[in-house]
Amino acid sequence: IHKSAICEPLQGENAWSYAEKLKLAISSIRDHMFSEFIFCDDAKLNEIEENIWIARNIRHAMEIGELFLVYQPIVDINTRAILGAEALCRWVSAERGIISPLKFITIAEDIGFINELGYQIIKTAMGEFRHFSQRASLKDDFLLHINVSPWQLNEPHFHERFTTIMKENGLKANSLCVEITETVIERINEHFYLNIEQLRKQGVRISICLLYTSPSPRD
């Protein structure tokens, strides 16, 4: 399929700037499988440029600690009791400020970085949960919810690595809930189901996470 990207040069724009915009537009063509032409205005080009910047900088951001976890309480609406907490990854860039998790998680999946990022999230969440549990009195049914991409569950030995991290932190399986993000849930393989089955056998809860926000437990 032959495609074309059309960018309207702005008044006073030099050839270098226009060439850079055209390169950004062409790089986005793979995301438009059914379009012969892609028209890129400044807003679209800014979005493409931001996506490329995220792809180039997310690994470094993780290494220098710009990526971190916050914990959203999960509350029973009837009793107002705190049932657990969901670990949510956030990115505050020194250069660009707050980066949307909906954007950087999706890009991490697109560039094949989600497994490395995902394991870092799991290690951090379990480690911080262990420290918090030692200082606070939590109920036995308190659940730590951790978002996991289907790409991670497609890995042959995910449940083994998850279990290893869990044991290293002295956590019980029934205190953890794996939240499966729905971004690419249609691209699952046989390892996906095996990993889920093995985690459930150990007592880990499994649920579906809608757009990285609200949990919906499934026993």
What is the role of each PLM region?
Residues 1-6, 133, 160-164:
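GGDEF/GGEEF active-site signature
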Residues 113, 117:
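Conserved acetyl-CoA pyrophosphate-binding loop and the N-cap/start of the following alpha-helix
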Residues 163-214, 218:
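The catalytic core of metal-dependent phosphodiesterases that act on cyclic dinucleotides
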Residues 10-68, 78, 108-112, 150-159, ...:
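C-di-GMP signaling machinery
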Residues 120-148, 164-175, 198-202:
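Helix C-cap/alpha-to-beta connector motif
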Residues 75, 150-152, 182-184:
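Active-site-proximal loop/turn and secondary-structure-junction residues that shape catalytic pockets
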Residues 1-3, 67, 85, 142-144, ...:
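PAS and PAS-like sensory/regulatory domains
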Residues 42-107, 147, 179, 208:
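Active-site core of bacterial EAL-family cyclic-dinucleotide phosphodiesterase domains
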